[in-house]
Amino acid sequence: MDEVLEMIADAVSSLVVAITDSEEKNTLFGDMVPGVELIQQAVNGMAEAAEETVSLIDEEFIGQLESTSKQLKNSAGQLYVHAVRAREDPWNRVPQKDAIKAAKQILQNVVLLVLIEEQSNIKVLVNIAKKAAEGVRRIDEIENIKQLDVMIGDVNQLQNELVKRSQRRSEGSHNPELRSKLEDIATMVNILSEQHQASARDVCRNPREETLRSKRSELSSKLLSAIDDLIYTIKLIFENNTKFVDLAFKWKPVRTMAEDEVTRASAVLIDNLRTLPKSIEAGNGPAAAREIVNAANLQISNAIIVANRCQDPVKKKMLLKQIEELKKLTPMLISAMKPVLENPNDQEAQKHLESVIYSTQKASEALATAVVSSPAEIVAASGVSLARDLDSLEEAIASGDKKRAQVILSHIPSAIDKHIELANALLETITDPGQRHQIKQSIERLQTLKPRIIENANRAIANPNDHEARKNLSSDIKEAKKAIGQISQPYEVVSALNTKIHNDLDSLIKCIDEGGPDMQVKGVQYAKDIANSIKKQIEAAEAYAQTITDPDRKKQVLDSIEQLKKLTPQLLEAIRACLANPDDKEARKRLDDVVRRVKEASSNLSQVIQPTADELKEEKRKRNEEIARIEAEEKAKARALLKAAELARIEAEEEKKRLAIIEEEKKRLAAEEEERKRAPKLVVPEGPVNKAVFGAAADVAQALESKVRDGTPLGILVQLSDEIAQQMALIASFAMNGDVKGMITAARKIADTIKQVQTQAKHIADNCTDPRLKQNVLTYCDCGGNFSTQLKILCAVKSNDFNDPTAEEQLVTCAKGLSGAVINLVKSSEAASIKQRKVPQQ
């Protein structure tokens, strides 16, 4: 598959270079049909091979695979049509440009086919890991030796398959550290499993021995932790292997067991919080409190595991903030319960308890969403929750529900503060000046509105007939929701709500499965939450659809919205029927089917609504225009205020400026002269991205400066590495000048040179007697080849899109990765050569 991918990448690169060269030189373009026919054959063969593997693909990805395969064939057909058009009218540049577009689409879809298959394999592997973990938990519950032997056999079978598949995944990693880590964890799983099973047998032989039970529990905990570490490392390998690729769909990563536990514990905690007042009335308050504390502690402990693993510093900061909030609220809840338990008629105590219950529920929901979301989605989810609280406050006041209004209002100040804090954290990840300005303005607006909302809400609650207060509150809430909408984009809101809808649907099914006297009450509440989330998701998607100008893409988004709209009443009806009679198997079957389709529709909507590069550019353009307008207004005001003073001292200022310019010019000329003396052979290009790429090339040159360049394999390898550094520097210069052909040519030269480097390095490795040094050389050989192929694909596919921040980041990351691989390859080859010279001659 990789060979086919590289072959198609080379063919696409050649086609792009040929067409670009013809356009630049204004020459007659030759017949591309024969070459396109070869591309078409390779593409169709790959698509057919992918379709034959449908039976082996997880059902979640079958639709994506079939759709991508179909698009791939269509793109190949379109490329052929454009090639024929270009042959019939060789001076017409339009079909040539259409051919470039179709060729790039082919390459993107080929990459997607590979990724879809990999995702499916990972999901199967993770499911095996979770089944093995469930078996480990069941072993801890068994005290009959025969039953234990049966369960151990099942677990061993799962773990053997898990280790075998893990080793296969490690072989596909481009990162030596992750590959080694996965192998070590797989070994640890085997060791801990044997120890745990032996301990479980000891317990069966001596069931009353508490020491043995304690040892079994300790080993079980370590084994489950190791299995979860294995799942997390598999996720990291996939993310590391695909960080250079723009996915056409939003990949929904598999969840670790710690992430699953956060979600499950949140559902238990929220269920207990909702029924807490009834439990207190029935005299079960202390027992309910214990359940709440246990669920909160379980959610917090697993969330801490997720936070400690998190490699994104901004997301980690957000997670720790959410964890601290739930930690703070749990003892507050217990304290608020005590006066109610002592005096159930204390209205003030009851009101305070309900406020703390509401805040704790919100904190738990937010944490459950955050562990499986990106920083932008965490902020969007917080904004959705805050906007819903504001709407609920207004509705409660309008309906005269003073008690509920007071409960919601008690939570809103801290909710606004929390949202502002999360938005400020998100600012750390944003470099676009327009977007930063927009978010800062929205934060300032929320800070201004917060005291006004509290004041007007208190007035309206105290006097429902105070129409002025209600009018002002409505206006303030409208402004606050607008500010919230300026912090998070609609597509981020849709993705955040997709996570919440999935979590709530899973909790609903779990609630029905567990039954109990409060099942219907809990189920109705889940149904309300789900319906509200779907409504908000549709509203956000419709708002974004109105901004889309591409008719085909707009239709795709609207079709996805319509599909979710149709399913919503079906879902609510299925929930109603199942809650009315949980034992009705047909009703349950319908509910499971509708839940599955709603999840798919919600996920599909969150995928198709993700913005294209053109849409992101348009958003950026509008923000920049707004900044320019504001800056122009501010400058005009400043000029009007300073005009009189400037006229009075204009002569003195002009003289100062003239002298300063002369002095500055002298300094500039002197600095330029000094710079010319020290200047490298290549001029450092302008722009942070181009400088970063040039810097990566300079790192290679500096690292090799003192190396010997002779006719030995190591000397030849160093000379070839010099050539790679030279071509990387040229890519930076070509990118600065917008030279597409130059970038592609330089990338291809790097790929060709890397192959020569690999030849020399493998020669050194073959003659090295130290296995560890030999493996290091071969590892960095593979890394260099992977990075050069990714660079070649990136320059071919994204060559016209380098104003896109994502493309810029990918170019810099790829250049730095290639630089590091080349430097480490030379170092490891040098070490291997030294080891070789120490071998005595025969």
From Swiss-Prot:
GO terms for cellular component: adherens junction; basal cortex; cell cortex; cell-cell contact zone; cell-cell junction; cytoplasm; cytoskeleton; focal adhesion. Epithelium. Its main location: cytoplasm. The keyword Ribonucleoprotein does not apply. Belongs to the vinculin/alpha-catenin family. It comes from Dictyostelium discoideum. Disruption phenotype: Cytokinetic defects when knocked out with mhcA. Aberrant epithelial organization and localization of exoc6. Mis-localization of myosin in the tip epithelium causing actomyosin ring malformation in stalk, which appears significantly wider. Distribution of Golgi and centrosomes not polarized. Abnormal intracellular distribution of dcsA. It is found in: Cytoplasm, Cell cortex; Cell junction. This is Probable vinculin. The keyword Zinc does not apply. GO terms for molecular function: actin filament binding; alpha-catenin binding; beta-catenin binding. The gene is ctnnA. One of its GO terms (biological process) is sorocarp stalk morphogenesis. Pfam families: Talin_IBS2B, Vinculin. SUPFAM superfamilies: alpha-catenin/vinculin-like. Keywords: Actin-binding, Cell adhesion, Cell junction, Coiled coil, Cytoplasm. It comes from the Eukaryota. Residues 585-679 form a coiled coil. Monomer. Associates with F-actin. Interacts with aarA, ctxA, ctxB and rgaA. Involved in cell adhesion. Thought to play an important role in cytokinesis B, probably by providing substrate adhesion and traction forces. Required to organize and polarize the tip epithelium during cytokinesis. Required for the normal distribution of myosin in the tip epithelium. Involved in the localization of ctxA, ctxB, dcsA, exoc6 and rgaA. Thought to form a complex with ctxA, ctxB, and rgaA which regulates myosin accumulation to the apical plasma membrane.
